[in-house]
Amino acid sequence: HAPAVAQLVAFIERAEQTALGVANQHGVAALRDNPDAMGTSLDMLRRAAATLLRLAEHAANRPLIRRHERRLLSLVMSQILDQKVAHELADVLFHC
C-alpha cells in the first residue's frame, strides 16, 4: 500500500498546485466556474481523499500514512483545496 498512499497524496498535491496556478492567473471565480481546470474533477479528488481515509481506518496502514503526515497537513490547511477533500484528509490525520 505504500506506493498507493504516496501516489494518492501526490495526485491531490498536483491538483492543488494546478488550482493555485489557475486561481493566480485567472482568479478564484474561474476555478469555481470550471473546477476541471485544475486538471481533474472534484469527484476524483474526493475519491482519492476517501480512499486515503479508508486506508487510514485500518491500523496496519497507519505507519504508511504517517510518512506523509506533513504533506497531508499542508493539504488540509490549503486555502484553495475543496473543503470536502480537506475535511476527509483531516480525518485521515485524526486516524493516524
What are these regions (language model features)?
Residues 1-67, 80-96:
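Alpha-helical solenoid repeats of the armadillo/HEAT superfamily
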Residues 67-74:
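Amphipathic alpha-helical scaffolding segments
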